[in-house]
Amino acid sequence: MVGAAAAEAATVRYYSVAPDVRLNVRSGPGTSYGIIRVLPEGAKVPIYCQTPGTSVSGPYGTSNIWDNISNGEYVSDAYVNTGSDGYVADRCS
């Protein structure tokens, strides 16, 4: 198992997206990847694993961490309230 599939075997926590933000979900860990969909305001996301990518500035600071929220779907950690500036989940493999 790899990526989100492997992480699904573990306990997954859900985290809130920053208030008043419609967050782009991308096909990879960076702003150069295509937008797959947009999360609505008030969304909560699971974090299956995290990986480094494009550095992004958002409500929770500047971060190069990207959160894998589903198979092939990533959001910038700078927009997710994890309570930490670092990794809160295993790194994606």
What are these regions (language model features)?
Residues 6-27, 38-41, 86-93:
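SH3-family beta-barrel domains
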Residues 29-34:
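Short alpha-helix capping/helix-loop boundary micro-motifs
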Residues 37-85:
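SH3/SH3-like beta-barrel superfamily modules
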Residues 4-6, 66:
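A generic alpha-helix preference that emphasizes hydrophobic side chains
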